[in-house]
Amino acid sequence: MRAKWRKKRVRRLKRKRRKVRARSK
């Protein structure tokens, strides 16, 4: 159960992280 909602959150975080990484570069 915890991994289920965690996977959904991780997917969103991954998208946001990609944007942050491009800004840092």
Curated annotation (Swiss-Prot):
Keyword Ribosomal protein applies: yes
UniProt keyword annotations, A-Z: Ribonucleoprotein, Ribosomal protein
Gene Ontology biological process terms in this record: translation
Listed Pfam families: Ribosomal_L41 (PF05162)
InterPro entries according to UniProt: Ribosomal_eS32
Annotated GO CC locations: ribonucleoprotein complex; ribosome
Additional detail: Initially thought to be part of the large ribosomal subunit. Crystal structures show eS32/eL41 to be a small ribosomal subunit forming a bridge at the interface of the 2 subunits.
Assembly mode: Component of the small ribosomal subunit.
Protein name stated in the entry: Small ribosomal subunit protein eS32
Species this protein is from: Eremothecium gossypii (strain ATCC 10895 / CBS 109.51 / FGSC 9923 / NRRL Y-1056)
Lineage: Eukaryota, Fungi, Dikarya, Ascomycota, Saccharomycotina
